[in-house]
């Protein structure tokens, strides 16, 4: 396989210039709307919220003691911070210089948290939505150039497939917070025609769930943070054996409500577009491979934790044949794990064959 040959070439070069190679730090970065997951070639891995917090006023500045804070710490201090999420629907906002500055603060923090050495050559593979625009990828690479030596942006579902060794006759469905990315893997680097990006994903589910709950219980005090907590605890499609009840607040007092039907409605609202996209990509394979593809449908991302998902999709695909639908074992890190593996197996000088690259 060509990857193996290139990996061997890199190994030869490492033995020739071992001193330089051992100072190369590889990063696999799954840069998400809600969370960013990172793995490094030195065994470090971490997850943080994709958010930057800035003091709302001088009191907030006094409490914080610095101009801004990134990640989970920012979210915990949200009462006196202005929270900025630099990624919308999985891609960087291009609205203003302020938005770009927020994204730069996030990316700088991510790389710093990987703990590179002073003399390290930092090489990062960064995941983006399957159909991210060229302009958006160029913007991300421009910022990456400020904090790493070489960067490659690749499709997020392709990263998952690479990490799982599923690069042929496979459909990967990555349900994130901002986007659901669906990719047909055919043994080559996927092109635009092999990929679909849907904006109905985790954040959309939160909004639908909040509205569905308030429709039944208008007295509740609700926001998307509460809806997200309900989703993470009870999300399901299909049938559920027992009632889902959650403790809310109404007029400041605790009240427990049955949210089973609301959760079902919100979660299943994602499914029609996903099923339709799988069907379209399935038909793009040569007919002799389609039965094999049906045996290799993989769900990844936070949305793959929805209970009953595999069985639900398998049933919806029944007209096409007997499908084997699975969910990844580690939705949090499978994307960046694939990115790191790609970075380590393929020398950076060949990254331009896979996607957009900076620093070469």
UniProtKB/Swiss-Prot annotation:
Knocked-out gene: effects: Non-polar single gene deletion has wild-type growth and motility. Has half the number of magnetosomes which are mostly incorrectly positioned and of lower chain length; magnetite crystals and magnetosome morphology are normal. No magnetosome-associated filaments are seen. Incorrect subcellular location of MamJ. Incorrect positioning of magnetosomes in dividing cells, leads to uneven distribution of magnetosome crystals. Deletion of 3 consecutive genes (mamJ, mamK, mamL) leads to cells devoid of magnetosomes or a magnetic response.
InterPro entries, per database record: Actin (IPR004000), ATPase_NBD (IPR043129), MreB_MamK-like (IPR056546)
Entry annotated with the keyword Cell membrane: no
A cellular component term, taken from the record's GO annotations: cytoskeleton
Function: Protein with ATPase activity which forms dynamic cytoplasmic filaments that are involved in sorting, concatenating and/or correctly positioning of magnetosomes in the cell. Not absolutely necessary for assembly of short chains. Filaments grow from the both cell poles towards midcell, and are probably disassembled at the other end of the cell, a process known as treadmilling. Polymerizes in the presence of ATP, GTP or a non-hydrolyzable ATP analog. Required for correct segregation and positioning of magnetosomes following cell division.
Residues annotated to bind ATP: 22, 33-34, 89, 177-179, 231-235, 302
Locations listed in the record: Cytoplasm; Cytoplasm, Cytoskeleton
Family, similarity comment: Belongs to the FtsA/MreB family. MamK subfamily.
Protein EC: 3.6.1.-
Note: This bacteria makes up to 60 cubo-octahedral magnetosomes of about 45 nm in diameter which contain membrane-bound crystals of magnetite (Fe(3)O(4)). Expression of just the minimal mamAB gene cluster (MGMSRv2__2365 to MGMSRv2__2381), including this gene, is sufficient to form a minimal magnetosome chain with small magnetite particles.
Catalytic activity: ATP + H2O = ADP + phosphate + H(+)
UniProt keyword annotations, A-Z: ATP-binding, Biomineralization, Cytoplasm, Cytoskeleton, GTP-binding, Hydrolase, Magnesium, Metal-binding, Nucleotide-binding
Record: residues binding Mg(2+): 156
Name used for this protein in its record: Actin-like protein MamK
Single annotated GO MF: metal ion binding
UniProt key word Translocase: no
Superkingdom to which the source organism belongs: Bacteria
Subunit structure: Forms cytoplasmic filaments. Interacts with MamJ. Forms filaments in the absence of other magnetosome proteins and in E.coli. Filament formation in vitro requires ATP, GTP or a non-hydrolyzable ATP analog.
Protein activity control: Filament dynamics depend partially on MamJ.
Top enzyme class: hydrolase
One GO BP: magnetosome assembly
SMART domains per the UniProt record, alphabetical: ACTIN
Pfam families assigned to the protein according to its UniProt record, in alphabetical order: MreB_Mbl (PF06723)
Induction: Part of the probable 17 gene mamAB operon.
């Amino acid at each position: 396989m060509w990857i193996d040959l290139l990996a061997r070439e890199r190994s030869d070069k490492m033995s020739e210039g071992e001193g330089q190679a051992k100072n190369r730090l590889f990063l696999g970065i799954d840069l998400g709307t809600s969370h960013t997951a990172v793995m490094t070639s030195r065994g470090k891995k971490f997850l943080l919220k994709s958010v930057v917090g800035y003091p709302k006023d001088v009191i907030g500045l006094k409490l914080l003691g610095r101009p801004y804070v990134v990640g989970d710490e920012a979210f915990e201090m949200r009462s006196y911070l202005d929270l900025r999420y630099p990624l919308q629907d999985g891609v960087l906002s291009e609205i203003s210089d302020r938005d770009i500055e927020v994204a730069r603060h996030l990316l700088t923090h991510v790389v710093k948290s990987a703990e590179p050495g002073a003399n390290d050559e930092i090489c990062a593979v960064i995941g983006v939505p399957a159909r991210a625009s060229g302009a958006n990828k160029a913007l991300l690479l421009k910022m990456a150039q400020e904090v790493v030596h070489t960067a490659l942006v690749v499709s997020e579902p392709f990263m998952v497939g690479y990490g799982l060794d599923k690069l042929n006759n496979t459909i990967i469905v990555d349900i994130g917070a901002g986007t659901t990315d669906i990719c047909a893997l055919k043994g080559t680097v996927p092109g635009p025609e092999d990929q679909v990006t849907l904006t109905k994903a985790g954040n959309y589910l939160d909004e639908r769930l909040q509205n569905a709950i308030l429709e039944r219980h208008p007295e509740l005090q609700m926001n998307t943070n509460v809806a997200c907590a309900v989703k993470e605890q009870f999300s399901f499609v299909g049938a559920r054996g027992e009632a889902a009840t959650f403790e809310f607040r109404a007029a400041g007092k605790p009240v427990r409500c049955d949210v089973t039907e609301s959760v079902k409605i919100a979660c299943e609202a994602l499914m029609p577009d996903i099923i339709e996209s799988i069907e379209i990509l399935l038909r793009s394979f040569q007919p002799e491979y389609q039965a094999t593809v049906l045996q290799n449908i993989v769900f990844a991302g936070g949305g793959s934790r929805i209970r009953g998902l595999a069985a639900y999709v398998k049933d919806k695909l029944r007209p096409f044949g007997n499908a084997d639908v699975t969910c990844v074992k580690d939705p949090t890190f499978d994307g960046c794990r694939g990115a790191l593996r790609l970075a380590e197996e393929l020398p950076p000088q060949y990254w331009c064959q896979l996607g957009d690259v900076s620093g070469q």
